[in-house]
Amino acid sequence: MAKNNQSAKARMGAIGESLVVAKLMQQGWDAFNANCTIKNYKSIDIICLNSDLREDGDLRWKPKTALVQVKTCNQKNIPIGFTMEQTQDIKYLEDNVKGPYVLIYREEKDGGSKYRFFVISRKDFIKLAYELHHWYIHDWEREKPLVLSAPAGFPIKNLMGEDEKETSRHKAFHNPFKGITFEDKWENIWKE
Protein backbone atom coordinates (compact mmCIF):
# COMPACT_ATOMS: atom_id res chain seq x y z
CA MET A 1 0.00 0.00 0.00
CA ALA A 2 1.35 3.44 -0.92
CA LYS A 3 2.29 5.79 1.91
CA ASN A 4 -0.47 8.29 1.06
CA ASN A 5 -3.05 5.47 1.11
CA GLN A 6 -1.78 4.42 4.55
CA SER A 7 -2.08 8.02 5.74
CA ALA A 8 -5.62 8.30 4.38
CA LYS A 9 -6.57 4.99 6.02
CA ALA A 10 -5.07 6.09 9.35
CA ARG A 11 -6.89 9.42 9.08
CA MET A 12 -10.20 7.65 8.38
CA GLY A 13 -9.62 5.43 11.43
CA ALA A 14 -8.84 8.45 13.62
CA ILE A 15 -11.99 10.22 12.40
CA GLY A 16 -14.06 7.12 13.19
CA GLU A 17 -12.60 6.85 16.69
CA SER A 18 -13.25 10.54 17.37
CA LEU A 19 -16.84 10.23 16.14
CA VAL A 20 -17.43 7.24 18.42
CA VAL A 21 -16.03 9.10 21.45
CA ALA A 22 -18.45 11.96 20.68
CA LYS A 23 -21.40 9.56 20.23
CA LEU A 24 -20.63 7.80 23.53
CA MET A 25 -20.39 11.12 25.34
CA GLN A 26 -23.73 12.18 23.82
CA GLN A 27 -25.22 9.13 25.57
CA GLY A 28 -24.01 10.59 28.89
CA TRP A 29 -21.05 8.25 29.23
CA ASP A 30 -17.40 9.19 29.73
CA ALA A 31 -15.09 8.03 26.94
CA PHE A 32 -11.52 8.55 25.84
CA ASN A 33 -9.31 7.26 23.08
CA ALA A 34 -6.79 4.66 24.26
CA ASN A 35 -4.64 5.45 21.23
CA CYS A 36 -3.79 8.89 22.63
CA THR A 37 -1.12 7.33 24.84
CA ILE A 38 -0.13 4.20 22.90
CA LYS A 39 -0.20 4.33 19.12
CA ASN A 40 -2.77 1.82 17.86
CA TYR A 41 -3.33 0.06 21.19
CA LYS A 42 -3.96 -3.66 20.51
CA SER A 43 -7.63 -4.71 20.47
CA ILE A 44 -8.86 -1.54 22.22
CA ASP A 45 -9.49 1.89 20.72
CA ILE A 46 -11.81 3.55 23.25
CA ILE A 47 -12.38 3.16 26.96
CA CYS A 48 -15.92 4.03 28.00
CA LEU A 49 -17.25 4.43 31.56
CA ASN A 50 -20.89 4.39 32.67
CA SER A 51 -21.26 5.80 36.20
CA ASP A 52 -24.93 4.69 36.30
CA LEU A 53 -23.89 1.03 36.11
CA ARG A 54 -21.44 -0.91 38.29
CA GLU A 55 -19.14 -3.83 37.66
CA ASP A 56 -20.10 -7.18 39.22
CA GLY A 57 -18.85 -8.87 42.38
CA ASP A 58 -15.83 -7.49 44.19
CA LEU A 59 -15.58 -4.67 41.64
CA ARG A 60 -19.07 -3.23 42.33
CA TRP A 61 -17.45 -0.02 43.62
CA LYS A 62 -16.19 0.64 40.08
CA PRO A 63 -18.20 2.21 37.21
CA LYS A 64 -19.06 -0.18 34.38
CA THR A 65 -16.23 -0.09 31.84
CA ALA A 66 -16.31 -1.06 28.16
CA LEU A 67 -13.20 -1.61 26.04
CA VAL A 68 -14.40 -0.64 22.57
CA GLN A 69 -12.83 -1.53 19.22
CA VAL A 70 -13.64 0.74 16.25
CA LYS A 71 -13.34 -0.15 12.56
CA THR A 72 -14.06 2.48 9.91
CA CYS A 73 -14.38 1.69 6.21
CA ASN A 74 -15.84 3.10 3.00
CA GLN A 75 -16.68 -0.37 1.67
CA LYS A 76 -19.92 -2.24 2.33
CA ASN A 77 -17.94 -5.20 3.71
CA ILE A 78 -16.25 -3.79 6.82
CA PRO A 79 -12.98 -5.54 7.79
CA ILE A 80 -13.14 -6.74 11.41
CA GLY A 81 -9.45 -7.08 12.25
CA PHE A 82 -9.25 -10.88 12.04
CA THR A 83 -8.44 -13.33 9.25
CA MET A 84 -11.02 -15.80 8.03
CA GLU A 85 -9.01 -18.58 9.65
CA GLN A 86 -9.01 -16.78 13.02
CA THR A 87 -12.81 -16.43 12.91
CA GLN A 88 -13.10 -20.22 12.98
CA ASP A 89 -11.27 -20.52 16.31
CA ILE A 90 -13.79 -19.60 19.02
CA LYS A 91 -11.14 -19.73 21.76
CA TYR A 92 -8.94 -17.35 19.79
CA LEU A 93 -11.85 -14.93 19.35
CA GLU A 94 -12.80 -15.16 23.03
CA ASP A 95 -9.20 -14.37 24.00
CA ASN A 96 -8.78 -11.49 21.54
CA VAL A 97 -12.15 -9.74 21.37
CA LYS A 98 -11.86 -7.51 24.45
CA GLY A 99 -15.25 -5.79 24.27
CA PRO A 100 -17.91 -4.42 21.93
CA TYR A 101 -17.21 -3.24 18.40
CA VAL A 102 -18.40 -0.13 16.63
CA LEU A 103 -18.21 -0.68 12.88
CA ILE A 104 -18.52 2.49 10.84
CA TYR A 105 -19.50 2.65 7.19
CA ARG A 106 -18.41 5.93 5.61
CA GLU A 107 -20.34 6.83 2.49
CA GLU A 108 -19.43 9.70 0.18
CA LYS A 109 -22.57 11.64 -0.70
CA ASP A 110 -23.07 15.00 -2.40
CA GLY A 111 -19.46 16.03 -1.83
CA GLY A 112 -19.52 15.10 1.86
CA SER A 113 -19.33 12.07 4.09
CA LYS A 114 -22.18 10.30 5.83
CA TYR A 115 -21.36 7.87 8.64
CA ARG A 116 -23.41 4.86 9.74
CA PHE A 117 -22.62 3.23 13.09
CA PHE A 118 -23.14 -0.47 13.84
CA VAL A 119 -22.70 -1.33 17.53
CA ILE A 120 -22.27 -5.02 18.33
CA SER A 121 -21.66 -6.60 21.73
CA ARG A 122 -18.63 -8.81 22.30
CA LYS A 123 -20.71 -12.01 22.45
CA ASP A 124 -22.70 -11.16 19.31
CA PHE A 125 -19.52 -10.14 17.47
CA ILE A 126 -17.94 -13.54 18.16
CA LYS A 127 -21.10 -15.42 17.13
CA LEU A 128 -21.54 -13.50 13.86
CA ALA A 129 -17.82 -13.68 13.00
CA TYR A 130 -17.79 -17.45 13.47
CA GLU A 131 -21.09 -18.30 11.76
CA LEU A 132 -20.81 -15.89 8.83
CA HIS A 133 -17.28 -16.97 7.96
CA HIS A 134 -18.02 -20.67 8.51
CA TRP A 135 -20.67 -20.26 5.81
CA TYR A 136 -18.31 -18.27 3.57
CA ILE A 137 -15.51 -20.83 3.93
CA HIS A 138 -17.57 -24.04 3.65
CA ASP A 139 -20.77 -23.29 1.71
CA TRP A 140 -19.46 -21.61 -1.43
CA GLU A 141 -18.56 -23.22 -4.76
CA ARG A 142 -15.15 -21.90 -5.85
CA GLU A 143 -12.85 -22.54 -8.78
CA LYS A 144 -9.80 -21.45 -6.76
CA PRO A 145 -9.16 -22.29 -3.10
CA LEU A 146 -9.97 -19.62 -0.56
CA VAL A 147 -7.01 -17.91 1.12
CA LEU A 148 -7.77 -18.31 4.82
CA SER A 149 -5.23 -15.64 5.76
CA ALA A 150 -7.39 -13.05 3.95
CA PRO A 151 -9.13 -10.42 6.08
CA ALA A 152 -12.57 -11.26 7.42
CA GLY A 153 -15.35 -8.71 7.23
CA PHE A 154 -19.00 -8.04 7.99
CA PRO A 155 -21.22 -6.98 5.08
CA ILE A 156 -23.59 -4.18 6.04
CA LYS A 157 -26.62 -6.26 5.03
CA ASN A 158 -25.67 -8.87 7.67
CA LEU A 159 -25.22 -6.12 10.29
CA MET A 160 -28.78 -5.07 9.36
CA GLY A 161 -30.06 -8.57 10.20
CA GLU A 162 -30.47 -9.79 6.63
CA ASP A 163 -29.84 -13.32 5.37
CA GLU A 164 -27.97 -14.27 2.20
CA LYS A 165 -30.20 -16.05 -0.31
CA GLU A 166 -29.06 -19.24 -1.98
CA THR A 167 -27.52 -18.80 -5.42
CA SER A 168 -25.80 -21.07 -7.91
CA ARG A 169 -22.51 -20.12 -6.19
CA HIS A 170 -23.45 -20.67 -2.54
CA LYS A 171 -25.98 -22.02 -0.07
CA ALA A 172 -28.17 -19.63 1.88
CA PHE A 173 -26.75 -17.97 4.98
CA HIS A 174 -29.23 -17.88 7.85
CA ASN A 175 -28.20 -14.88 9.89
CA PRO A 176 -28.26 -15.73 13.63
CA PHE A 177 -29.49 -12.14 14.12
CA LYS A 178 -32.18 -12.19 11.41
CA GLY A 179 -34.41 -9.15 11.69
CA ILE A 180 -32.14 -7.50 14.28
CA THR A 181 -30.16 -4.46 13.21
CA PHE A 182 -27.02 -3.35 14.99
CA GLU A 183 -27.27 0.15 13.52
CA ASP A 184 -27.15 2.85 16.22
CA LYS A 185 -27.65 0.26 19.00
CA TRP A 186 -25.46 2.13 21.49
CA GLU A 187 -26.91 0.14 24.40
CA ASN A 188 -24.95 -2.86 23.05
CA ILE A 189 -21.82 -1.21 24.48
CA TRP A 190 -22.90 -2.52 27.91
CA LYS A 191 -23.91 -6.05 26.89
CA GLU A 192 -21.55 -9.01 27.16
What is the meaning of each model-derived region?
Residues M1-K42, I47-E192:
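Mixed-charge (Asp/Glu-Lys/Arg
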